[in-house]
Design a protein with these regions (language model features):
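Short acidic/His-enriched helical or mixed secondary-structure segments at domain edges of catalytic enzymes
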Residues: 1-10, 20-21, 53-111, 146
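Non-catalytic, conformational "gating/processing" segments within enzyme and secreted inhibitor domains
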Residues: 124-126
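M16/insulysin-pitrilysin zinc metalloprotease superfamily fold
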Residues: 14-74, 142, 155-158
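Short, electropositive, low-hydrophobicity segments enriched in small/polar residues
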Residues: 12, 16, 96, 136
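An aromatic/glycine/proline-enriched structural segment found at the starts
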Residues: 130-159
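Non-catalytic beta-strand/loop surface segments
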Residues: 1-38, 83-84, 102-122, 148-159
Length: 159
């Protein structure tokens, strides 16, 4: 919300967890104007670091509502239904797994939320991938304290 509503840097920023039978990833992403890259990355960094702070009841309620409402999208289109059925088959899930997930979300407490954040959100282990012109962006990225950047060409080869 900061990047879009407060700063006007982007039309949207998103986060997601993805997984399979193997451990998955947490991704936070956004497309921003080149002249806002450094500040935008710093906002992401600060937000991720702020997850260490305990959540309050209002934020927990908001998160629960967003999560529960987003489940409705799993039933909106034939493609979404196909993906849900595919997940049931691929991961040997019970047919009512959505109900089970919603129950877990409804029963989430501040303490259980904070324990999950502590376990899975580890900003010091995150990889920041910035796509842009190194000539204009590299110095700004160095100033954020991420260590030495790895610069890749468009084919993914180290430069």
């Amino acid at each position: 919300m900061i990047l879009r509503e407060e700063k006007g840097f982007t039309y949207g920023a998103r986060t997601r967890f993805s997984g399979s039978r193997l451990p998955g990833t947490f991704t936070a992403s956004s497309g921003v104007r080149s002249n806002t890259t450094e500040e935008s990355v710093n906002i992401f960094k600060n937000l991720m670091t702020a997850y260490k702070n305990p959540i309050n009841e209002e934020d927990l309620k908001f998160t629960k509502n967003v999560t529960l409402r987003s489940n409705a999208r799993q039933f909106e289109t034939l493609g979404a239904l196909r993906r849900m059925i595919s997940n049931i088959a691929n991961y040997d899930l019970p047919f009512d797994y959505i109900n089970n997930q919603e129950k877990i979300v409804r029963e989430m407490t501040i303490d259980s939320h904070n324990a999950l954040v502590k376990k899975y959100i580890r900003p010091d282990e995150m990889i920041y991938l910035i796509v842009g012109d190194a000539a204009t962006q590299l110095n700004g990225m160095k100033s954020l304290g991420f260590g030495n950047p790895v610069i890749l060409d468009k084919e993914g080869n180290s430069l």
